[in-house]
Amino acid sequence: MKEKKISVIEMPLDFGASRHGSDMGPSAIRLAGLGNKLEDLGYDIVKYDCPIQINPKEYEDFGNPKAKFLEPIKKSCITLAEEVEQAVDNDVFPLVLGGDHSIALGSIAGISAYAKKNNKRLGILYVDAHGDFNTDETSPTGNIHGECLAASCGYGLPDLTNLYFEGTKVNPKNICYVGTRDLDNGERELMKKAGVTVFSMSDIERHGFAAILKKVIVFFKSHADIVHVSFDMDVLDPMFAPGTVIPLPAGLTNREALLLMEEMADTNLVKSAEIVEVNPVLDVRNQTAILAVSLIARLLGEKIY
């Protein structure tokens, strides 16, 4: 039996969001028992650390109002990309703990570098209430956590689109969203132009989660050789995950999210993952972080029976 190896990469970065607190997300997830859960699942934890250091002075000036805190985000995400690429090169599963969703710039760049040199089609499962498909021209806030996926597809500031290596990181036609329910006008138009696939909460209400889940699995089996899962806890209804950066009503239930992770695990396509925007400042008895651990476990092969 092949040994299962995992590298847990903590990214306590919240420069990409207007509401701070997600920098404490990795600690909350660790305290919720992630290490023990991974060992119970038979994983060899080859690394569990934080590769970045945040200087408090970096909070004093956000710089470009169209892409706030661009420089510290770039620096951190380049480091993350290196960590992710190194892990997959060594047949180690990189699990990234955010932090806000701007860290996806680094995660996706790292797994993309691996995919390109191994001639693999990279797919992205983007489980998020939001599109994160703004650019510096369309963003109403200038917060980079709302621009990260567009940049990974080649849209936006060159500082972001060319992060880690020059050029597009993922074909937008290989991206599938689940649980979307809040899009800005500009990003909606860009998403349509780019050709991403979106299964919104309206689709889930209209057709039922089971039917949508089947479509998600079919999508990745036909569009990808490897998949990166990018899971933002705000996709969940605040009833189940109150401790997120931007809680929105009418989201996924915990059961739906857990089943999605379990079904993705069964595809044997998932090569890397991140879970982001756990905000302990807004949480209740750490329940959001506890649920994050359960979601990670299902994605990594945990079964009820």
Where are these regions (language model features)?
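Catalytic cores of soluble, metal-dependent hydrolases
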Residues: 2-13, 19-95, 107, 114-117, ...
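Active-site metal-binding loops of divalent metal-dependent hydrolases
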Residues: 13, 100-101, 129, 180-181, ...
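Active-site histidine-anchored catalytic micro-motif
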Residues: 89, 93-164, 267-268
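Short active-site oxyanion
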Residues: 92-94, 172-176
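Short, structured patches in soluble enzyme cores that scaffold and shape functional sites
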Residues: 126-129, 153, 174, 179-182, ...
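Internal, well-ordered alpha-helical segments in soluble enzyme and binding-protein domains
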Residues: 129, 133, 145-148, 171, ...
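Active-site environment of divalent metal-dependent phosphoester hydrolases
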Residues: 134, 183-185, 280-282
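Short, glycine/polar-rich helix-capping loops at beta-to-alpha or helix-loop-helix junctions
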Residues: 182-193
